[in-house]
Amino acid sequence: MQGLVKPSFSMTFKCRSGFVTTMHIAMVSGEYPPRWGGIGSVVYHLAGHLASRGHDVTVITRTHKQATPQQPGVSVLHVPWVKAPMMFTRSYGKHAFVELRRLHQVKPVDVVHTLLPLVSWTRKEYRWVEEHVAPVVSALNGSWIGEREGMKRAARHKEAATWKNPNDLAILLTGGYYARYEQAGIEGSTACVAISASTKAEFEHWYRPPEDWWCETVLYGVDHKVFRPMNHDHEEEQLAYEELRKSYGAADEAALTGDASTETPLLLAVGRLVARKGHRTLLRAMPSVLKQHPGARLVIVGRGHMGRTLMRQAKRLGIAHAVHIQPGMSFDQLALHFRAADVVVYPSYYEGQGLIPLEALASGTPVVTVNQPPLTEMIDEDVGELFTCGDHEDLARAVNRCLDQPEERTQQMVRGRQRVLDHYTYEHNAEAYEAIYESMLS
């Protein structure tokens, strides 16, 4: 498993403001709740866990109409931004740079933690921050070039047209241009942290890291308290579970008691309704799944432009009766879906890491996903099944293998949960980043 072992040296270290026992960490992130995207959720939990370890954390993020959730020890500063695809990263980056300078004058910063690629700084800006504020650690959350190449792969496998989504179209057309800001980040930061070995390899292949590049690999964790296995002995939880299963028509007697031998298995796919998430490939696999498991039902949860496209495809394939698309839901409902599902399917064509599979494992649900990095850094046959990316027939075979082996699936549920607890929690992440910060400053 990937990760960084915390050094054994003392928590007391020398920084520019003298000897201290806590750090003031400025996190520069284009996403933060109520933007609960992958990066937003990670920064929220990482900031909270760093604060719980005694550090002061200030998050500089984009303005939002809704209120920001509060956490002890975490301050949030909002800056304006231009509401345009890709351009917002530079607009936000400029305002965040100014706000960071102001913050440092009021409350000296010990470490600057940027979340790429959603903040675009120039080489000059990185140099100024390193010289006048604090050392920078840049988290590499995938790359624009990687996103672009993932879209091209999805197009080759007849996923939806990229031009239907303005954000995807902007990445396709301008990803190469905005990659210059990622290049500035890997050149101008004291340290970088890739969110997977695959992402680190992307930067080594498509970008130009300096010869003395310091880049660690730390895979993000998930909230193992929110995403947890089903408790069938808890009356209210069991009633909610039964209601959910019945609403999708996946509620035979075995299913309602959590028996893995159910003949009405519930498949769950979570992810934005965009081409590179592979939902159309999943739909093409469903006729073969239903032929072998006619009682199976598929629920797709995600926002995006493709909802109608997917339902039209389901009707053409004759599987509309077995497919449900949910445009979005609360965290509590999403967590219940993860617990209630028999299998989570994740057919994505590109991820910097991909948190959905870990949320599934934490919930005690096996995962069927693509046999390529970074997914294979987290998922193997001990906790699920793998299939060839873009091959809907192989996807169907993988799902059927999982459903055909209820006893093995029960063991996968246990092993998956334990894997998360052992390696992929926000507690692990806070410890790893704290060690990196200390190494930068010692």
Each model region followed by its residue ranges:
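Membrane-proximal helix-turn-helix segments that form the acceptor-binding/catalytic region
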Residues: 160-192
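Aromatic "clamp/platform" in nucleotide-sugar-dependent glycosyltransferases that forms part
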Residues: 349
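Carbohydrate-associated surface elements
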Residues: 198, 221
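A conserved mid-protein helix/loop that constitutes part of the nucleotide-sugar donor-binding site
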Residues: 41, 45, 265-288, 305-311, ...
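Conserved acidic donor-binding segment of nucleotide-sugar-dependent glycosyltransferases
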Residues: 381, 385-392, 401-407
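Short alpha-helical donor nucleotide-sugar binding micro-motif in glycosyltransferases
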Residues: 328-329, 336-341
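Short hydrophobic beta-strand element within catalytic cores of glycosyltransferases
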Residues: 366-369
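Nucleotide-activated donor-binding/catalytic signature segment of Leloir-type glycosyltransferases, i.e.
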Residues: 311-329
